[in-house]
Amino acid sequence: MNGREHRRGDEAARREARSILFQNQDRSIVLIDVPTSIEEAQASPEEVGCDAGPLRKRRRLISSEPPHLPFKTPEPKAGSGGLTESVSDLMIAAAATEALRVLQESYAGPFCLPRVTRPNPLKSAFVPKGSFFLHGTVSSERDRFAAEAPVFDLIVLDPPWPNRSARRKQRNYRVADSLGSIRETLSLIPIAAHLAPDGLLAVWITNKAGVVELLTGPRGLFAQWGLEQVDEWTWLKITTSGEPIVDVGSTWRKPWERILIARRRGSSRKPACRGRVLVSVPDLHSRKPNLRGLFEDVLVPSNKGLEIFARNLTAGWWSWGDEVLKFQQPEYWVES
């Protein structure tokens, strides 16, 4: 079966999430529409897989205009020296380049679905069926979480890693002051007590080397939580024409973010697909694709998931963060 044949053409494919625009045969390369993945997360997986339910009313997420051309990014002057590509960056660049090649050769459709960019506010914030949220910081809600939260098959962390460019842009996007301060915050989360024996932890990370060491080092947070890294995924951001938003060989800026996946030590659980490359046309700043549909093997049949530092809700999941209702607010949605 080639890539074109694998696009949704048969009955099974039609029941897949609309947000998955393409995936190759071994599902190692996935083209995912960011806003649609969040729209689908407002309903249960069963409702997403059929024509009935809330999605039929097409509650739409307000999005930014998708980028049509790559971003301009400065590069060091020739001969400036001092900057070299890490082995990790070279490996990710190779995987990203291969994903772009597969898409070019095997996929002929659009790289993102039509977006709603004009607001038409609803009367109140939307809370998906079966969702539960803690609206507050890790420190303020920790005791309540420890007392009330169940164990989860999947925990997703999207920490506010230190980011000078985010602070410069002043997008009302809160980031930590330093790696030390974010480590202190993450150490407060009782991951070990609330991750199921065969559960997985997925952590969005930046490309800063210190972030990986903070999590995976001998004295890192994974060790503190009794976990071990089992996989790494890449989220590759592209334009509407399929080009990376910046060149994959750029020195100062990379067109990808990464997801580290960990399990309990001694567990045999692994993601169904290893080393995945998720490919998307990006949306609003800090808005990432919802991962629920990509971890079906972990979540079925329980759908017991948790997202920490969440900025939107997911049906059937717990969500926790001081901006947990941000993208559930009326100004971000319309019905069509």
Swiss-Prot record:
GO terms for biological process: methylation. Its EC number is 2.1.1.348. Keywords: Methyltransferase, RNA-binding, S-adenosyl-L-methionine, Sporulation, Transferase, Virulence. Induction: Transcription level is decreased by CHV1 virus infection. Residues 61-83 are annotated as: Disordered. It catalyses: an adenosine in mRNA + S-adenosyl-L-methionine = an N(6)-methyladenosine in mRNA + S-adenosyl-L-homocysteine + H(+). Transmembrane segments: none annotated. InterPro entries: DNA_methylase_N6_adenine_CS, MT-A70-like, SAM-dependent_MTases_sf. Disruption phenotype: Drastically lowers the m6A level of APHA mRNA and reduced its expression. Significantly decreases the methylation level of the ZAP1 mRNA. Exhibits a growth rate defect and displays an irregular colony margin. Leads to a significant decrease in sporulation. Also significantly reduces virulence on chestnut stems and red Fuji apples. Displays more sensitivity to both oxidative stress, osmotic stress, or cell wall integrity stress. GO terms for cellular component: nucleus. Changing D158A: Abolishes the catalytic activity. One of its GO terms (molecular function) is nucleic acid binding. Belongs to the MT-A70-like family. N6-methyladenosine RNA methyltransferase that plays a crucial role in fungal phenotypic traits, virulence, and stress tolerance. Mediates the methylation of mRNAs to produce N6-methyladenosine (m6A)-containing mRNAs. M6A is a modification present at internal sites of mRNAs and some non-coding RNAs and plays a role in mRNA stability and processing. Mediates specifically acid phosphatase APHA mRNA stability through a YTHDF1-dependent m6A modification of the A1306, A1341, and A1666 key methylation modification sites. This is N6-methyladenosine RNA methyltransferase MTA1. It comes from Cryphonectria parasitica (strain ATCC 38755 / EP155). The lineage of its organism: Eukaryota, Fungi, Dikarya, Ascomycota, Pezizomycotina.
